[in-house]
């Protein structure tokens, strides 16, 4: 059931994203909401995995595989919402997402690469390897948060 709901929601979000062919016609606030929604969903599916990596939550291979699959898609979604027209919209994103776009893109690519590795490792069933990859993936999240997001 969750997979069906997620698939429908993802299809709606992707459809909305693809229908917005010219960013200049899209309200900057809409782009910010889109990227924030993708980040919230990443947090939802990352939370249990982070808990497993830290030993706070019992390891569950099925949850790892499912959530890693969701994260593989979600890790690609927010980036087209970080455009110059959004710089004046209140959000936690620092101006560096625009002014240092190359470094920001590198961080995005690292995240996507590590999430893809997590998906592959999760299929192998080796708990130690999965936990090691969870740590590596988590570090890529921190790389963006440290350099491109306001400190909380």
Set out the residue ranges of the language-model regions:
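Sequence context surrounding c-type heme c attachment/ligation sites in exported
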Residues: 29-61, 67-152
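N-terminal signal peptide c-region/cleavage motif recognized by signal peptidases
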Residues: 17-21
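Bacterial N-terminal signal peptides that target proteins for export
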Residues: 1-9
């Amino acid at each position: 059931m969750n997979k069906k709901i997620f698939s429908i929601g993802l299809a709606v979000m992707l459809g909305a994203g693809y229908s917005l062919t010219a960013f200049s016609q899209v309200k900057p606030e809409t782009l910010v909401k889109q990227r924030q929604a993708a980040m919230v969903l990443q947090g939802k599916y990352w939370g249990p995995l982070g808990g497993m990596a830290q030993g706070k939550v019992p390891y569950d291979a099925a949850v790892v595989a499912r959530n890693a699959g969701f994260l593989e898609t979600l890790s690609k979604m927010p980036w087209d919402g970080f455009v110059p027209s959004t710089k004046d919209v209140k959000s936690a994103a620092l101006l560096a997402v625009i002014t240092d776009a190359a470094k920001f893109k590198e961080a995005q690519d690292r995240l996507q690469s590590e999430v893809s590795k997590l998906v592959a490792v999760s299929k192998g069933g080796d708990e130690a390897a999965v936990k090691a990859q969870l740590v590596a993936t988590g570090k890529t999240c921190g790389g963006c948060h440290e350099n491109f997001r306001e400190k909380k």
